[in-house]
Amino acid sequence: MFIRNCWYVAAWDTEIPAEGLFHRTLLNEPVLLYRDTQGRVVALENRCCHRSAPLHIGRQEGDCVRCLYHGLKFNPSGACVEIPGQEQIPPKTCIKSYPVVERNRLVWIWMGDPARANPDDIVDYFWHDSPEWRMKPGYIHYQANYKLIVDNLLDFTHLAWVHPTTLGTDSAASLKPVIERDTTGTGKLTITRWYLNDDMSNLHKGVAKFEGKADRWQIYQWSPPALLRMDTGSAPTGTGAPEGRRVPEAVQFRHTSIQTPETETTSHYWFCQARNFDLDDEALTEKIYQGVVVAFEEDRTMIEAHEKILSQVPDRPMVPIAADAGLNQGRWLLDRLLKAENGGTAP
């Protein structure tokens, strides 16, 4: 089961073409995505209500889409507007439509009760389209449940072991984070990690304009069910970074990691690593992107193998350790939200 009354990401804006049909499975539901004649994204059930033929192998006609099995035509609200050879259209001849919002270069979709869809609840990823930041968008498909990816993101002690040559340093294994949970009902977690007078990760070393020890930070906010935004960077040791000062030679990033369940055992993952320096250096943009891709492939190797083991021995217990503090809170919040949607007590 999935949490449904929340905003999920369906695609980067560039994944949905100006003309033509795009499709994805989200939360076990086949979804069709396309742009109308005004460029607005439309999200419909990717299934003709007549014989359940997939609409993505149909044809876009203006703002509508036509099934190319028997020719039924649907408008952006999901209503059938034409049945070839039949004048009367039964009221039940319709398909599901989904609320959708395009913001910060992401296409957001609401898979639950449409009446509860409030665009004001969408998490802000301003660095995606801000002129003061530069990034290259990325996407990974996972053969794993999305919660395993969330576990990974809420426990950065794994950086020392999974990413020793990319994102991690030895100190990541022992540093204890500060974990704060929002109590206003959002369920958001803020996790802060400071590495003072420490080595930089290789990813930071590759772009830094200073050498030697650094004060490094990872301040990440996670919003359920699977939206992570992070402020991370390195500054020369002793230059006031923990107090909020950012000297010109400091390297600063804003990171995005977003997951949407595809099925119970597969997931979509959107990411980027934005920077606020050397904005016109396209080679640097590609270098940072490729560095993150290498690191995330390290994650995927571990997480997909983890999924396979869990499917083989689903009833074997897992023994918690201190490093699980963040992911345990995340799991607890996800469980509460799911129960609330299904008649339990609201979080």
From Swiss-Prot:
Encoding gene (name): tsaM1
UniProt keyword terms in alphabetical order: 2Fe-2S, Aromatic hydrocarbons catabolism, FAD, Flavoprotein, Iron, Iron-sulfur, Metal-binding, Monooxygenase, Oxidoreductase, Plasmid
Coiled coil: none
Catalytic activity annotation: toluene-4-sulfonate + NADH + O2 + H(+) = 4-(hydroxymethyl)benzenesulfonate + NAD(+) + H2O
Protein name per UniProt: Toluene-4-sulfonate monooxygenase system iron-sulfur subunit TsaM1
Residue ranges of domain Rieske in the record: 7-109
Gene Ontology MF: a single term: toluene-sulfonate methyl-monooxygenase activity
Quaternary data: Homotetramer. Part of the p-toluenesulfonate methyl-monooxygenase complex TsaBM, comprising the reductase TsaB and the oxygenase TsaM.
Residues that bind [2Fe-2S] cluster: C48, H50, C67, H70
PANTHER family cross-referenced by the UniProt entry: 3-KETOSTEROID-9-ALPHA-MONOOXYGENASE, OXYGENASE COMPONENT, IRON-SULFUR DOMAIN CONTAINING PROTEIN
Cofactor(s) for this UniProt protein: [2Fe-2S] cluster
Lineage: Bacteria, Pseudomonadati, Pseudomonadota, Betaproteobacteria, Burkholderiales
SUPFAM superfamilies: Bet v1-like (SSF55961), ISP domain (SSF50022)
Matching CDD domains: RHO_alpha_C_DMO-like
